[in-house]
Curated annotation (Swiss-Prot):
The lineage of its organism: Eukaryota, Metazoa, Chordata, Craniata, Vertebrata. SMART domains: WD40 (SM00320). It is found in: Cytoplasm, Cytosol; Golgi apparatus membrane; Cytoplasmic vesicle, COPI-coated vesicle membrane. Its main location: cytoplasm. Oligomeric complex that consists of at least the alpha, beta, beta', gamma, delta, epsilon and zeta subunits. Probably interacts with PEX11A. Interacts with SCYL1. Interacts with JAGN1. This is Coatomer subunit beta'. The coatomer is a cytosolic protein complex that binds to dilysine motifs and reversibly associates with Golgi non-clathrin-coated vesicles, which further mediate biosynthetic protein transport from the ER, via the Golgi up to the trans Golgi network. Coatomer complex is required for budding from Golgi membranes, and is essential for the retrograde Golgi-to-ER transport of dilysine-tagged proteins. It holds the Pfam family B-prop_COPA_B_2nd. The keyword Nucleus does not apply. WD repeats lie at residues 13-52, 55-94, 97-136, 140-180, 183-224, 227-266, 350-388, 390-425, 746-783. The keyword Repeat applies.
Length: 906
């Protein structure tokens, strides 16, 4: 089987002819030098052009990043080397390097050197620490030197390719070549070193349309790759994947297996001739330069070949080398969430195939390595070969001794104890297989689950899965697709019953085999089950777990991570990245066990687990209980006062809510509790809550609704003391204390309103208020103040005022007492009364009458106003409390003092 290389185009940048490309080691940038004299920097993540350097008017055939100096170094047909700062776009240095076109630049990985090659047949070494002086010249080629590359395993050695049909290997410090490789029939355009430690290989491409692999120790050609129809312009060993990439003037890019030399894939993006290729260690990105622009493609799987067993032993593949690390060896070292673990790595040996995936079997005794269309099962301890074979795919069963392979797109074989047990052909073919409690087979028609023992169809589901994860008990399964994931419950008892009776069995299997528990619109990258909790990493780099319909975020990851496993005794979850770094995050097994018990409605088990959960984690558990509908248990478990208060309100637990409100001393909480108390008809508690909340509007509503005159009176005093003047005014007014309303308006500077109130309800006070109004207004507008008319001075402007004095006295004497509410039906409404008629024959006292006739208003009735002393402010709540549950409606003031104004007219 060919390598399973996913090839995705990440960037297409249209431009003039591209002569060289380079990738930045840390930024998502691609550097492209163009035939028109420009150099561009593209961001391949955002698909945008981020920087442009106008170098010259001639072709720029070479450009390289020098990341440690923030430089871009260019070489052009004007023979000049230019150095730019890619942050400021400033040109740092420029000098003439050769006497002909500059073909290639190579940057030394550790020293302050660059190597340049040219059509003048020379290679030169430049030292930027010595003001860009030429440290050495390498002579020997007899034609253009097309490319130079430094040996990644020996930085003092480099190789060069020339149109003189030779490849020369040089040593820094020696002006003559170490040796020359000959074999191409035409000029050699490109060269590259193999970066792995197992092969001393070089690759070259030439105008004879051939690609040759050389052993530079034995100085022999070990392989020739044929296939291109035109000159081979670029050739490269990928630094991470076991592939060779070649590009040609025939417009194609060919990908070859670096071990078998088999052609794996041919790419043609329709951008004419391919001139250059660049790749980067630690990345699967490959940059290509063509006549019509540049392209970045992503090759292969990002997911590393890595696996961990239940005891914390991790095995991974670094190229073809298999290594092991043991979490137990860390002992009691302090581990912080998200930090790289300092693991001791042990080499286990080399694998005969290039591992694309590594996976332990369920009990951890064996590990399977898959790649190159083959699988090898090793013992996990010593990496001894136990079994092997050809397969496109491999899957372990839940039974550790059983596994399946996909031999082709139509045949699946099942093995037991390393011996073939059964072979079958799924009805609709087999594009992929999945292990677990049932054997999953994906086809063009969807997903089919089969019984491991007899390969009977259990259920066919119209879904195209990407991953399938089974829980340890086999009751739950997660099916992850490209856009979402589904949680299903496997009903094994119904399956057994259907297999015995054959009831409910259709051509799509057993109808009741699965029950859908939920669908979540999130992309799962990797996942595993702990109990009934599904833990997964998402496409947006979040580490979450799903339980009972709730998604809990454990951590936000700063890069793509892959789940390895969970160690219950450590209470930690372990993940790895593509650089084989291992990190961990805390996840308490007690929390997961509790949530699992709740999901199974096993509350006795949940109660046993609860004491083992730390207090700081209990609120998280309480939120889970609340979402499951168990609010009473959530109230008991939660330690967050805010959460407990909300739950107490929802459950109507007045006592608990009251205690929490007392502790919180929050006005908002008192208001919320007051609403609940009113809904529960607990008016005494509601009054206390409203008082704590200083909600005078609410207290007024409560007092008036209950007809509690004493409460209204006390409320008026308290509201005035605290500056709640509107409530104070309304409270006085409802009690018929119009004189107190008047004094309140005067004290608060509302003199116009006071004047109109006096004219309507207290005619005897009009003159006094007008004088105060005039005095106050004169400070602002003297003319306006003089226009105000005082009744004592302009009696003709206030007809009927004397009669109003009499009516006022009559009202004071006849309406002084409160009437019981039971007399309300006997009281005539204001709109049906004529107070002037009712007051006929009334004789006011001599003193009051004489004052009125003399034009002097009677002294105002004293108004009792709450003092501002500390004693008044600290009144006990007991003074405001009233037993509203046993309320008698005897003391409601039904005296209507809102006299219509028309009764004061003549």
């Amino acid at each position: 089987m060919p390598l399973r290389l996913d090839i995705k185009r990440k960037l297409t940048a249209r431009s003039d002819r591209v002569k060289s490309v380079d990738l930045h080691p840390t930024e998502p940038w691609m550097l492209a030098s163009l035939y028109n004299g420009s150099v561009c920097v593209w961001n391949h993540e955002t698909q945008t052009l981020v920087k442009t350097f106008e170098v010259c008017d001639l072709p720029v055939r070479a450009a390289k990043f020098v990341a440690r100096k923030n430089w871009v170094v260019t070489g052009a047909d004007d023979m000049q080397i230019r150095v730019f700062n890619y942050n400021t776009l400033e040109r740092v240095h420029m000098f003439e390097a050769h006497s002909d076109y500059i073909r290639c630049i190579a940057v030394h990985p550790t020293q302050p050197f660059i190597l340049t090659s040219s059509d003048d047949m020379l290679i030169k070494l430049w030292d930027w620490d010595k003001k860009w002086s030429c440290s050495q010249v390498f002579e020997g080629h007899t034609h253009y030197v097309m490319q130079i590359v430094i040996n990644p395993k020996d930085n003092n050695q480099f190789a060069s390719a020339s149109l003189d049909r030779t490849i020369k290997v040089w040593q820094l410090g020696s002006s003559s070549p170490n040796f020359t490789l000959e074999g191409h029939e035409k000029g050699v355009n490109c060269i590259d070193y193999y970066s792995g430690g197992d092969k001393p290989y070089l690759i070259s491409g030439a105008d004879d349309r051939l690609v040759k692999i050389w052993d530079y120790q034995n100085k022999t050609c070990v392989q020739t790759l044929e296939g291109h129809a035109q000159n081979v312009s670029c050739a490269s060993f990928h630094p991470e994947l076991p592939i060779i990439i070649t590009g040609s003037e025939d417009g194609t890019v060919r990908i070859w297996h670096s071990s078998t030399y088999r052609l794996e894939s041919t790419l043609n993006y329709g951008m004419e001739r391919v001139w250059c290729v660049a790749s980067l260690r630690g990345s699967n990105n490959v940059a290509l330069g063509c006549d019509e622009g540049s392209i970045i493609v992503k090759l292969g799987r990002e997911e590393p070949a890595m696996s961990m067993d239940a005891n914390g032993k991790i095995i991974w593949a670094k190229h073809s080398e298999v290594q092991q690390a043991n979490l137990k060896a860390m002992g009691n070292a302090e581990i912080k969430d998200g930090e790289r673990l300092p693991l001791a790595v042990k080499d286990m040996g080399s694998c005969e195939i290039y591992p694309q995936t590594i996976q332990h079997n369920p009990n951890g005794r064996f590990v399977v390595v898959c790649g190159d269309g083959e699988y090898i099962i090793y013992t996990a301890m010593a990496l001894r070969n136990k079994s092997f074979g050809s397969a496109q795919e491999f899957a372990w069963a839940h039974d550790s001794s059983e596994y399946a392979i996909r031999e082709s797109n139509s045949v699946v074989k099942i093995f037991k104890n390393f011996k073939e047990k059964k072979s079958f052909k799924p009805d609709f073919g087999a594009e992929s297989i999945y292990g677990g409690f049932l054997l999953g087979v994906r086809s063009v028609n969807g997903l089919a689950f089969y019984d491991w023992d007899n390969t009977e169809l259990i259920r066919r589901i119209e879904i195209q899965p990407k991953h399938i994860f089974w829980s340890g008990s086999g009751e739950l399964v997660c099916i992850a697709t490209e856009e979402s994931f589904f949680i299903l419950k496997y009903l094994s008892e119904k399956v057994l019953a259907a297999q015995e009776t054959h009831e409910g069995v259709t051509e799509d299997g057993i109808e009741d085999a699965f029950e859908v528990l939920g669908e979540i619109q999130e992309i799962v990258k990797t996942g595993l089950w702990v109990g009934d909790c599904f833990i997964y990493t998402s496409s947006v780099n979040r580490l979450n777990y799903y339980v009972g319909g709730e998604i809990v975020t454990i951590a936000h990851l700063d890069r793509t991570m892959y789940l390895l496993g969970y160690i219950p005794k450590d209470n930690r979850l372990y993940l790895g990245d593509k650089e084989l770094n291992i990190v961990s995050y805390s996840l308490l097994v007690s929390v997961l066990e509790y949530q699992t018990a709740v999901m199974r409605r096993d509350f006795s088990m949940a109660d046993k687990v609860l004491p083992t959960i730390p207090k700081e984690q209990r609120t998280r558990v309480a939120h889970f209980l609340e979402k499951q509908g168990f609010k009473q248990q959530a109230l008991t478990v939660s330690t967050d006062p805010e959460h407990r208060f909300e739950l107490a309100l929802q459950l109507g637990e007045l006592k608990i809510a009251y205690q929490l409100a007392v502790e919180a001393e929050s006005e908002q909480k008192w208001k919320q509790l007051a609403e609940l108390a009113i809904s529960k008809c607990q008016f005494g508690l509601a009054q206390e809550c409203l008082h704590h909340a200083q909600d005078y509007g609410g207290l007024l509503l409560l007092a008036t609704a209950s007809g509690n005159a004493n409460m209204v009176n006390k409320l008026a005093e308290g509201a005035e003391r605290d500056g709640k003047n509107n409530v104070a005014f309304m409270s006085y007014f409802l009690q018929g204390k119009v004189d107190a309303c008047l004094e309140l308006l005067i004290r608060t500077g509302r003199l116009p309103e006071a004047a109109f109130l006096a004219r309507t309800y207290l005619p005897s006070q009009v003159s006094r208020v007008v004088k105060l109004w005039r005095e106050n207004l004169s400070k602002v507008n003297q003319k306006a103040a003089e226009s105000l008319a005082d009744p004592t001075e302009y009696e003709n402007l206030f007809p009927g005022l004397k009669e109003a004095f009499v009516v006022e006295e009559w009202v004071k004497e006849t309406h002084a007492d409160l009437w019981p509410a039971k007399q309300h039906p006997l009281v005539t409404p204001n709109e049906e009364r004529n107070v002037m008629e009712e007051a006929k024959g009334f004789q006011p006292s001599r003193s009051t009458a004489q004052q009125e006739l003399d034009g002097k208003p009677a002294s105002p009735t004293p108004v009792i106003v709450a003092s501002h002393t500390a004693n008044k402010e600290e009144k006990s709540l007991l003074e405001l409390e009233v037993d509203l549950d046993n309320l008698e409606l005897e003391d409601i003031d039904t005296t209507d003092i809102n006299l219509d104004e028309d009764i004061l007219d003549d």
